[in-house]
């Protein structure tokens, strides 16, 4: 579960390393976000010569959470980190590569481009 003030790692090659969530999109008083939800966040830590700068406000989709993901078949899934992928206003990823596995729920939410760039979909 990701909420306001949560810090996430960035799982793409835009140059951002860490972001801080300050809004969960999808409802007027929505508190938590899980895998596949879109958040608005601020870039906190960047690599040199990156396409995003520190302090930039970006949209991101959550691809991994430490909290359990419960599936309809009864199985659960948990990752080691809270991670996201930075997207543009149309929902396409800003980076050209995605690092690490992502959950299958990303494709179900309509982010097909992100799931096709990922090396492994669990």
UniProtKB/Swiss-Prot annotation:
GO terms for molecular function: large ribosomal subunit rRNA binding; structural constituent of ribosome. The keyword Lyase does not apply. Pfam families: Ribosomal_L14 (PF00238). InterPro entries: Ribosomal_uL14, Ribosomal_uL14_bac-type, Ribosomal_uL14_CS, Ribosomal_uL14_sf. One of its GO terms (cellular component) is cytosolic large ribosomal subunit. SUPFAM superfamilies: Ribosomal protein L14. GO terms for biological process: translation. It comes from the Bacteria. Transmembrane segments: none annotated. Keywords: Ribonucleoprotein, Ribosomal protein, RNA-binding, rRNA-binding. Part of the 50S ribosomal subunit. Forms a cluster with proteins L3 and L19. In the 70S ribosome, L14 and L19 interact and together make contacts with the 16S rRNA in bridges B5 and B8. Belongs to the universal ribosomal protein uL14 family. PANTHER family: 50S/60S RIBOSOMAL PROTEIN L14/L23, LARGE RIBOSOMAL SUBUNIT PROTEIN UL14M. Binds to 23S rRNA. Forms part of two intersubunit bridges in the 70S ribosome. This is Large ribosomal subunit protein uL14. It comes from Chlamydia trachomatis serovar D (strain ATCC VR-885 / DSM 19411 / UW-3/Cx).
């Amino acid at each position: 579960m990701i909420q306001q003030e949560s810090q996430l790692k960035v799982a793409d090659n835009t140059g951002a390393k860490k972001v801080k969530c300050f809004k969960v999109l999808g409802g007027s008083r929505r508190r938590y976000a899980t895998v596949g939800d879109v958040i608005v966040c601020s870039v906190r830590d960047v690599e040199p010569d990156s396409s995003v700068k520190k302090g930039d406000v970006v949209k991101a989709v959550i691809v991994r959470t430490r909290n359990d993901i419960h599936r309809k078949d009864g199985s659960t899934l948990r990752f080691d980190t809270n991670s996201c992928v930075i997207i543009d206003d149309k929902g396409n990823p800003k980076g050209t590569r995605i690092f690490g596995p992502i959950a299958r729920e990303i494709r179900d939410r309509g982010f097909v481009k992100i799931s096709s760039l990922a090396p492994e979909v669990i």
